[in-house]
From Swiss-Prot:
Official protein name in the record: ATP synthase subunit b 2
Keywords attached to this entry: ATP synthesis, Cell inner membrane, Cell membrane, CF(0), Hydrogen ion transport, Ion transport, Membrane, Transmembrane, Transmembrane helix, Transport
The keyword Zinc is annotated on this UniProt entry: no
One GO term describing the cellular component: plasma membrane
Transmembrane segment boundaries: 34-56
Role of this protein: F(1)F(0) ATP synthase produces ATP from ADP in the presence of a proton or sodium gradient. F-type ATPases consist of two structural domains, F(1) containing the extramembraneous catalytic core and F(0) containing the membrane proton channel, linked together by a central stalk and a peripheral stalk. During catalysis, ATP synthesis in the catalytic domain of F(1) is coupled via a rotary mechanism of the central stalk subunits to proton translocation.
Amino acid sequence: MADSHGNAKGATAHTEAGGGHKAPFPPFQKDTFASQLVSLTIAFVALYLISSRLALPRVRKTIDDRQNKIEGDIAQAQTLKNESDAALKAYEVELAAARTRAQAIGNETREKLNAEADTERKALEKRLSAKLADAEKTIASTRTAAMSNVRGIASDAATAIVQQLTGAMPDRKLVDSAVEASMKG
């Protein structure tokens, strides 16, 4: 097997230029500078054309699509906001109308109940006044009956007392007038 590393006949071990002189770095060589500028210009023009024809339209389309999507979303959000504002206003109007109706119903019911209560109170007062008048008549007739009974009892008692004390029966008219005078005064 042959040694493949550096021992072949006629092969130089290094790629250096002979004479110990080193060549300058290729991009800095003056004789290739113009051709390098042309190559660089061609590469940049090709890169510009490729990016402007292929990559930039895709990026521009993506940006435009995103912008359109954002604008559409903003428009939809504004539409929904306007609808919700309109619904809120309609709700507030309905709520105010419902409050007004509830207050009117409450006032009407209150007035109706007050009128019914006044009617019932007046009817009750009439019944109570009639019962009171009947009771006063009953009391007056009972008092009159009781007073007439008291006069009779007082007259009988006075007659019995005078008879016991004097032993003689007093005059009934005289005893009745004395009892009447003592009851008045």
